[in-house]
Amino acid sequence: MKISCCIPGGSFMPQGEKEVPMSSYDRLTEGCRVMRELGYDAAEATVGLIMALTDDEVSALQAAHRAGEFSLDACNSFIPGHLPIITDEKGTAALYDFVDRAISRMASLGIRYVVFGSGFVRRIPEDCDRAAAEAQIDAFICQVDACCEKYGMICVIEPLNKAETNWCNTVAEGAAVVRRLNLKNVKLLADGYHMSREGESYDVLAENRDILLHCHIASSDRKIPGTTEYEGGFLDTLKEIGYNGIVTVECGFGDFREEAKIAAEWLRAKLA
C-alpha cells in the first residue's frame, strides 16, 4: 500500500512564517518535493492546478516527469463549478470538451487516476426529473471512460456524504454505479471521512475489493488521520482485504508540515 497526501491550497510554511504567493507550477513542484520530504510515496493535486499551467509549464513538468523528478499519482476536484453535469446541450458540449482537455493534460504528466468527486456539479436540482438527471450523469461517466481509454487513465468515483451532494452518497451506492455501467476505466474510491459521516460499515470495503482502486483518509472530523476511532478501523480493514492501492490523506491542516508529517508517521506505523 502506498501513502499519499493532497497538496494543500494554503501555505506549506510553518505557522507564523510568511509564504510568498506561489504559481500553480511552483505549488505542484514544491508540493511533490515536500511530500517526499515528509515521508509520503506520492502526492495528489487538484485538476484546477493542472489546468492553470501554461503550455511551457506543462512541457517543463513533462520533462521533469521523464527524468523522475516530478510525480503525481492522482488528481481530484475534477470538474469546475461552472460546468454542471445536469445541463443543456450547449453546456454538455462545454463539459465534455473540458473533460477531454483535462484528461489529455493529466495523462501527459504521467497521472494515473482522476477522482470524480465534484459534489456541486453532480448535484441533482430539486426541480429536475431524477431519472433523467441520473441518465445525464451516466452519460457523463461514459464520456469520461471513453477519454480515459483514449489517453490511458482511470477514473474513480468518489461517494460523498449527503451534506455535500445528493447523488452517490455511500461506497455501496458508488459500487452499484460502477458495476451497473461496467466500464473498463471507471472504478471505485472509498473515503473514510465520508463513510464515517454516513455511518457506513467497513464490510463494504471487503464486498467491493475487486473494484476498489483508490482511497482517501481523514479523521471523522476531517482533521489528520489517527485522531478519531473510525479511520483506524478503516485502515485495518484495507490491510485485511489485501488492498494494495494508494491511501491519500485528504483533510484540513493547521500547520501543514507538522501535521502532514504526523499523519505520515501514523500511516507508516499502522501499515507496518
Task: State what each model feature region is.
Residues 1-111, 183, 210, 253-254, ...:
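N-terminal pre-domain/capping segments
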Residues 17, 42-43, 75, 138-236:
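Acidic/histidine-rich catalytic cores of soluble enzymes
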Residues 21-33, 67, 84-187:
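Active-site acidic/histidine proton-transfer and metal-coordination neighborhood
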Residues 22-24, 46-59, 82-86, 122-125, ...:
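Acidic-and-aromatic substrate-binding clefts and catalytic sites of carbohydrate-active enzymes
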Residues 61-63, 91-93, 132-133, 173-175, ...:
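Short, hinge-like loop/turn segments at secondary-structure boundaries
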Residues 233, 242, 254-266:
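Short, charged alpha-helical segments
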Residues 239:
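Catalytic-face loop-and-helix region of soluble metabolic enzyme cores
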Residues 246-251:
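Short acidic/histidine-rich active-site segments
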